[in-house]
Amino acid sequence: MPGGLLLGDVAPNFEANTTVGRIRFHDFLGDSWGILFSHPRDFTPVCTTELGRAAKLAPEFAKRNVKLIALSIDSVEDHLAWSKDINAYNCEEPTEKLPFPIIDDRNRELAILLGMLDPAEKDEKGMPVTARVVFVFGPDKKLKLSILYPATTGRNFDEILRVVISLQLTAEKRVATPVDWKDGDSVMVLPTIPEEEAKKLFPKGVFTKELPSGKKYLRYTPQP
């Protein structure tokens, strides 16, 4: 599949028609973090539950200066009509308004550019549809995270929020987040930081787990 982005790549500054009008991507992002996520088709069951959950979590993303924007190969008109179903799924007033725009990529230009097409899933004309892709961009417009799911498996937007919190924390502090980490849990001190420097950087304390190897690389500190 042609196109695609690698970690560290700058997001293409594309223009697109959306449910809130025409946008230029870099202008849309501004100085914020951004999540661009694609789905296979409007008016389908898994996609409805996904965008419903994204809408529910939109205030949590906004609190962290994260903008959401969705994409599929459907038209703006379909996006707006489908938005009523999404709001109804969330037991809210069935309006056309969602807390994020949806891109109209019916010609598949962006899907090809960004490597979002799923060759195994096709529309009624035999053309590939967009996979369940998630791109997280930092304020520098660079790709910080990419996730790719098949059409049959819905994404966990609570996990995407957790990952964004980790990305923002580790962008500001010299720490890493361990397996199953949640906001507020202890974090790990980077192995490149010498012991004496770590004590100064993390006044809440550094706790080292003793290991059979004798190496002192498992170092924890309360979340800064």
Swiss-Prot record:
Effect of C47S: Loss of peroxidase activity, but no effect on phospholipase activity
Modifications the protein undergoes after translation, according to the UniProt entry: Irreversibly inactivated by overoxidation of Cys-47 to sulfinic acid (Cys-SO(2)H) and sulfonic acid (Cys-SO(3)H) forms upon oxidative stress. Phosphorylation at Thr-177 by MAP kinases increases the phospholipase activity of the enzyme. The phosphorylated form exhibits a greater lysophosphatidylcholine acyltransferase activity compared to the non-phosphorylated form.
Influence of pH: Shows a 3-fold greater lysophosphatidylcholine acyltransferase activity at pH 4.0 than at pH 7.0.
Catalytic activity, as annotated: a hydroperoxide + 2 glutathione = an alcohol + glutathione disulfide + H2O; a 1,2-diacyl-sn-glycero-3-phosphocholine + H2O = a 1-acyl-sn-glycero-3-phosphocholine + a fatty acid + H(+); a 1-acyl-sn-glycero-3-phosphocholine + an acyl-CoA = a 1,2-diacyl-sn-glycero-3-phosphocholine + CoA; 1-hexadecanoyl-sn-glycero-3-phosphocholine + hexadecanoyl-CoA = 1,2-dihexadecanoyl-sn-glycero-3-phosphocholine + CoA
Swiss-Prot/TrEMBL site (Important for phospholipase activity) positions: S32
Regulation: MJ33 or lithium;[(2R)-1-hexadecoxy-3-(2,2,2-trifluoroethoxy)propan-2-yl] methyl phosphate inhibits its phospholipase A2 activity. CI-976 or 2,2-Dimethyl-N-(2,4,6-trimethoxyphenyl)dodecanamide inhibits its lysophosphatidylcholine acyltransferase activity.
Sites bearing N6-succinyllysine, chain numbering: K209
Single biological process term from Gene Ontology: glycerophospholipid catabolic process
GO cellular component annotations of the record: azurophil granule lumen; cytoplasm; cytosol; extracellular exosome; extracellular region; extracellular space; membrane; nucleus
Domain Thioredoxin intervals: 5-169
Positions of modified residues (Phosphotyrosine): Y89
One Pfam family here: AhpC-TSA
Active site (UniProt): C47, D140
Annotated spans, Required and sufficient for targeting to lysosomes and lamellar bodies: 31-40
N6-acetyllysine modifications at: K63, K209
Domain of life, source organism: Eukaryota
Main location: cytoplasm
Keyword field contains Methyltransferase: no
Location in or out of the cell: Cytoplasm; Lysosome
Note: The active site is a conserved redox-active cysteine residue, the peroxidatic cysteine (C(P)), which makes the nucleophilic attack on the peroxide substrate. The peroxide oxidizes the C(P)-SH to cysteine sulfenic acid (C(P)-SOH), which then reacts with another cysteine residue, the resolving cysteine (C(R)), to form a disulfide bridge. The disulfide is subsequently reduced by an appropriate electron donor to complete the catalytic cycle. In this 1-Cys peroxiredoxin, no C(R) is present and C(P) instead forms a disulfide with a cysteine from another protein or with a small thiol molecule.
Family, per entry: Belongs to the peroxiredoxin family. Prx6 subfamily.
Function according to Swiss-Prot or TrEMBL: Thiol-specific peroxidase that catalyzes the reduction of hydrogen peroxide and organic hydroperoxides to water and alcohols, respectively. Can reduce H(2)O(2) and short chain organic, fatty acid, and phospholipid hydroperoxides. Also has phospholipase activity, can therefore either reduce the oxidized sn-2 fatty acyl group of phospholipids (peroxidase activity) or hydrolyze the sn-2 ester bond of phospholipids (phospholipase activity). These activities are dependent on binding to phospholipids at acidic pH and to oxidized phospholipds at cytosolic pH.
Subunit structure: Homodimer. Interacts with GSTP1; mediates PRDX6 glutathionylation and regeneration. Interacts with APEX1. Interacts with STH. May interact with FAM168B. May interact with HTR2A.
Protein known as: Peroxiredoxin-6
Gene: PRDX6
